[in-house]
From Swiss-Prot:
Catalyzed reactions per annotation: (2S)-2-hydroxy-3-oxobutyl phosphate + 5-amino-6-(D-ribitylamino)uracil = 6,7-dimethyl-8-(1-D-ribityl)lumazine + phosphate + 2 H2O + H(+)
Classification via InterPro entries: LS (IPR034964), LS/RS (IPR002180), LS/RS_sf (IPR036467)
Residues that bind (2S)-2-hydroxy-3-oxobutyl phosphate: S85, T86, R127
Domain of life (superkingdom): Bacteria
Family named by the database record: Belongs to the DMRL synthase family.
Transmembrane parts of this sequence: none
Top-tier EC class: transferase
Described purpose of this protein according to its UniProt entry: Catalyzes the formation of 6,7-dimethyl-8-ribityllumazine by condensation of 5-amino-6-(D-ribitylamino)uracil with 3,4-dihydroxy-2-butanone 4-phosphate. This is the penultimate step in the biosynthesis of riboflavin.
Protein source organism: Caldicellulosiruptor bescii (strain ATCC BAA-1888 / DSM 6725 / KCTC 15123 / Z-1320)
NCBIfam families listed in its UniProt record: lumazine-synth, PRK00061.1-4
Protein name: 6,7-dimethyl-8-ribityllumazine synthase
Length: 155
């Protein structure tokens, strides 16, 4: 039996990060964690491009444009959608997750879902670098592993 998995070495890999400005007090921390994860694993700063979008709903469109360019080994989507008192949360969360998955499948480029979908601000803060670690860092690890796995499958 042969098994295949991606490594966490980022040398010579290119990454795009698409980040929502909405809830920036959370997303800025996710970005810090993401950049830390990539740089700790030998990704050169010159191989990281960061694209800001207004809100989480806009993330899939920019991811699609970047994936179609074939310039990146993986794309990381970062955002924070926090439940309010209207059904808006459900609509945005569902469309963002579906949109990101569709881009990845259609373009055959890993698009990593680093969008927090939380019931409270406290939950989001916990996932952006306090009690529950930093999900931006976790997204970077997934991007590294998937970029290398896809590279291995292609060769």
């Amino acid at each position: 039996m042969r098994t295949f998995e991606g490594s966490f070495c980022g040398k010579d890999l290119k990454f795009a990060i698409v980040i929502s400005r909405f809830n920036s007090f959370i997303t800025d921390e996710l970005l810090k964690g993401c950049l830390d994860g990539l740089k700790r694993h030998e990704v050169d700063s010159e191989n990281i491009d960061v694209y800001y979008v207004p809100g989480a709903f806009e993330i899939p469109l920019v991811c699609k444009k970047l994936a179609k360019s074939k310039k990146y080994n993986a794309i990381i989507a970062l955002g924070a959608v926090i439940r309010g008192s209207t059904p808006h949360f459900e609509y945005v969360s569902a469309e963002v997750s579906k949109g990101i998955a569709n881009v990845s499948l259609e373009q055959e480029v890993p698009v990593i879902f680093g969008v927090l979908t939380c019931d409270t601000v406290d939950q989001a803060i916990e996932r952006a670098g306090t009690k529950a670690g930093n999900k931006g860092f976790d997204a970077a690890m997934s991007a590294l592993e998937m970029a290398n796995l896809m590279k291995n499958i292609s060769s």
